[in-house]
Amino acid sequence: LGDVYKRQSEICSVPEAEKNKTEDYDFTGKRALLAEDNAVNAEVFQGFLKAVNAEVECADNGEAALSRYQNMPDYYYDMIFMDLNMPIMDGYEAAKSIRGSKKPDASDIPILAVTANAMAKDIVKVHEAGMNERITKPVQRELLYQTMEKYIL
């Protein structure tokens, strides 16, 4: 019986290489804006970002994200993560509004769609709204970090 539990423990345990993946990334001094209306998703995402020393500020809808972006100093955020389906203002409209703003970083700041939608038409809409790329839900931590590294390091 002891062997069964030991084997089950080996199968279910997280490999050491997986445990230390965050050590490969350090986003100290980088600040992200996360627009996400689902509190659980926001909490998980914040945990991923904080694990690699990134600062994160949250907005629970597109309008709040747009307001935060517009009311902060120029170049305050290094990246924006945008859920697409939110109340009040969706992520598509928020991204278009950010891109259309008069702030000097409006055309350059990386805006990444965070969505479960993986259809080709959804990807086209993401790019039409001015977003750089799409990260699918559920978010895979390693892919998130690689994408962040691509845009802000």
Model regions: which residues?
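C-terminal compact regulatory domains
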Residues: 3-153
